[in-house]
C-alpha cells in the first residue's frame, strides 16, 4: 500500500523523491509528501490528492538539500488530509519519519506522550512514533531509534531522518517491505524496486527486526540488539523499461499484451525432454515427500485466490490429492487443522500480502511444510516459505492483476503435472499430450489479442449497465469469479459471479430484462448443463454473452453474442478464456472514463491487515 522513498547523497534529494514516488503510484494512495534537510531545518511539503498536486504546490520553491524522505499515504488512521499526510515531525522539528503499516499500541503511547507535554497535529498512529523518538533521544540517534522499536507494537516499515544527524537515514521493518538501493556516492531507500530501478540494480532486502544506517557511502545493518547483520547484495534482473508502459495507453493494457511472453518465460526450463516431462529443480520432490502429506491448503487473497481455485482442480484431478482453498484473511482466524502432515501453498504476486504472510508464518509454527508461488524474488513471502517457485511475469504495475494471474495458472498446471508424474497418477502419453497443449498457450493468447474489436464493441454497448453477472461451472466458474472481479475493480460496475448450477437457489431473482450475463461454456463435461442454465437466463430476457472454444457452433443458438477463444484441453481453457474477460473489463473502464491503472480505493500490494 503506502509508498516510501529515501535519499542520501550529493544530488538534490527532492528530484529523486518525487520521481521515486511516481514509480510507486500503482500501490494506491490518497496523499503525498516529502521532507528535505536544507542545511538548517527539515522542510516538509505535503498535499492531499495525487502526486501532481504536490508537484504543483512546490513549483518555484522545491526544497533544496541532499538528504530526504518521501511518502504516498493510504489512510488507515485519520482521514485523507494535508495534516495527516506523511512525513510527520516532532514538536521541535528535529526529526521526521515516514511509515507504512499500523502501530497497534499507538493510543496508549499517545496518552503517555501527551501527558508529558507533546502536542499532536494529526490523527495518525505514525505521528506517535516521531514524538516517542523525540522523547527518548539524548544525543545518540541510533540508540534512540532502537529504543523506539522496543516500545512500539505492530507492523511497519519506517524511515527516520534528523537535522541533528544530516549524514544519515535510519530505516527498519516488521512485516512490511523495505529495500535499500546501493549507488555510487549515494544510497536509496524504497518500499518497492520500481522506485529505484532507474538508479541502481544493486539492493539489500531488509529483514524483519533489522535496522539499517544508510549514509551516502555506506550501509550498516544491525539487529535490534545492535549486533551487526551481514547482508547479501540482491541484483535486480529486470530493467527500468520493463516497468514502463512501452507505448501502451495504460500499464494494464501493456500487461495484458505481455502475457504470451510471461507465460513462455514461466514455462522456460521447466519442460524437459527427459524421463519426466516437467521439472522443478528448485523443489526436488519425490514420492516419499508427497506421500507424507494428508492434506494440501492453498491460501491467497483476491486474484491469487481465484488462481488457487483453479490450482485445486488441477492438483485433485491430476495428482489425486485432496486440496482446500482458503482466503488468507479467513484462514488465519478459523483455527485450521494444520500439522506436520500439511503442505501449505501460498500465492501472492507481490510476495508481501500481509494476510497471506501471516497465514504462512502461523502454518510454519504449527509444523506445516510450505511452498510459495510469487512473482517477486526476495519478497517477504519468498524468504519465509520453505520453498518457492516463481512466476516469471516481470513487474506488474497496474492494480488489476492480469499476467500474474495467467502465469499463476500455468505454474499450478505444471506443478500438478510434476506431482502427478512423481505419484504416477498420470499416463506418460497423457502427460506428453498436455505438455504439447501447454506449449501452445503463448501463441493462442497472441491469437486472442490480435482481434479485440468485438470486445471493444461489447464494452461500449454494455459498459454503462449497472449490473453484470457471470456464470460458469467447474473451471469456468473459477474464471467467472476472476472476470467479475476485474470488471468491478476497474470499471466500478457491480459484477458478481455465480456457479451456474446455483441460479435456481436465489440468483435468478436478479435476472431481469436487458441485464448482461456473461456465460462461460468451455468445459465439455458440464457443457449441456451450462446450456440449460443459459436457457434459464435467456427465458428471463437477459442479454447473454457466451465464451466458447472456436468451432463451437451450438452455443450461438442460445446467446446474443459469442466471444471465441482457441480450442484446447479442458485444463488449458481457463488460461485462454480469461483473456477476453480481462479485455472486456479494460475497455469497459475506458468507456466509463475510469482510471484503469489506479482504481479508486484500491492498492496493488495489500501490506496492512
Identify what each model region corresponds to.
Residues 7-10, 99, 119, 134-138, ...:
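Hydrophobic alpha-helical scaffolding
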Residues 291-433, 437-440, 522-566, 584, ...:
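Glycine-rich phosphate-binding loops that contact phosphosugars or nucleotide phosphates
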Residues 1-249, 261-294, 333, 428, ...:
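Conserved short alpha-helical segments that host acidic/polar catalytic motifs at enzyme active sites
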